[in-house]
Amino acid sequence: MVFEKIDKNSWNRKEYFDHYFASVPCTYSMTVKVDITQIKEKGMKLYPAMLYYIAMIVNRHSEFRTAINQDGELGIYDEMIPSYTIFHNDTETFSSLWTECKSDFKSFLADYESDTQRYGNNHRMEGKPNAPENIFNVSMIPWSTFDGFNLNLQKGYDYLIPIFTMGKYYKEDNKIILPLAIQVHHAVCDGFHICRFVNELQELINS
């Protein structure tokens, strides 16, 4: 893992960062419809497939890898790792696991299945211990679909990393649609960036 510190004085987002981080702290969320027909028709496992696809786009663009590290420094990670929740039916609680990214889905799926098998019965909130600092959070609410979703981070205005939440998929006009909520910090991510993410995610799923 490499964390490259940002020189704010030469950074092209300096005035935007200062405005949305300090003057007017601002996070926002967008909920979009993702066409997952190709995933279902190929018989791929939905959750790990979406984790993989989301991670691929996150790691393409620096705005989704920009963070304040544990030393309070602003910078960009060279890679982000998905941290995802699994649900425990017996206690109605969840645990967070994480799986390192791989360049191909087959390898990622093997590691994902290994992690869920090894740590899936650990009912602690941190199901797989020793999560690295370069993680981003993904969760799924498979019991209901939604048109809007928002996380309220009362003390989280210094949290720059995106958060992804998926809902229950449904059929619409011969397509299978998955709601996806994306929460970002305006200091590092504008509407253009989140829309580019959505478009590239859909293109990757369709390819």
From Swiss-Prot:
It catalyses: chloramphenicol + acetyl-CoA = chloramphenicol 3-acetate + CoA. Belongs to the chloramphenicol acetyltransferase family. Gene3D superfamilies: Chloramphenicol acetyltransferase-like domain. GO terms for molecular function: chloramphenicol O-acetyltransferase activity. It comes from the Bacteria. Keywords: Acyltransferase, Antibiotic resistance, Plasmid, Transferase, Transposable element. Its EC number is 2.3.1.28. The active site is at H186 (proton acceptor). NCBIfam families: chloram_CatA. GO terms for biological process: response to antibiotic. Homotrimer. It comes from Clostridium perfringens. The lineage of its organism: Bacteria, Bacillati, Bacillota, Clostridia, Eubacteriales. PROSITE patterns: CAT. This enzyme is an effector of chloramphenicol resistance in bacteria. It holds the Pfam family CAT. This is Chloramphenicol acetyltransferase. SUPFAM superfamilies: CoA-dependent acyltransferases.
